[in-house]
């Protein structure tokens, strides 16, 4: 097994958090609640979706380090809009959302820094049946999707 150092990934996440937290906190209410992307999501809903992504990644990273069984996780990608609606991100407190997003991603850094290197080849199967290793998950974290 090759040795892995994920410092470039964790440093990148930290840089995104530092830059984006400042930007997000300065956005006016009308921008975060009315401006929509091509999926018809507001900025509040997009940030909520990023929190959901972090929570799903967190669950996978931790479970892959101890599970002895093959793991199958639900297909979160098909349920994004449902997750956003059920959690009512549109009406959530903006400052709380920013802090939750920040803290969850800081915790992801902690999880990555503490990962059991002997478990990097542990894998789960996505909804298509494709195998995804812990190493691939970490290396595949997109800084534009933090």
Predicted regions located by residue number:
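Short, helix-capping/interhelical loops that line the mouth of catalytic, cofactor-
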Residues: 1-9, 33, 56-101
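Generic serine detector
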Residues: 4, 25, 53-55, 67, ...
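Amphipathic alpha-helix face/heptad-repeat signature
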Residues: 9-16, 50, 97-104, 137, ...
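Structural signal for well-ordered, non-membrane alpha-helices
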Residues: 14-25, 55-62, 102-116
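Acidic interhelical loop/turn segments
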Residues: 24-39, 74-88, 109-139
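Conserved small/polar residues in nucleotide/adenosyl-binding loops
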Residues: 144-146
């Amino acid at each position: 097994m090759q040795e892995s150092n994920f410092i470039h990934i964790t440093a990148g996440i930290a840089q995104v958090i530092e830059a984006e937290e400042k930007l997000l906190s300065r956005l006016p209410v009308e921008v975060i609640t009315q401006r929509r992307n091509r999926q018809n999501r507001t900025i509040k809903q997009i940030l909520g979706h990023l929190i959901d992504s972090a929570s799903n990644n967190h669950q996978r990273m931790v479970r892959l380090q101890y599970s002895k069984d093959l793991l199958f996780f639900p297909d979160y990608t098909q349920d994004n809009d449902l997750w956003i609606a059920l959690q009512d991100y549109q009406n959530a407190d903006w400052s709380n959302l920013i802090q939750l997003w920040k803290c969850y991603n800081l915790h992801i850094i902690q999880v990555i820094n503490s990962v059991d290197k002997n478990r990097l080849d542990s894998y789960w199967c996505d909804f298509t049946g494709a195998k995804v290793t812990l190493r691939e998950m970490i290396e595949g974290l997109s800084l534009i999707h933090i």
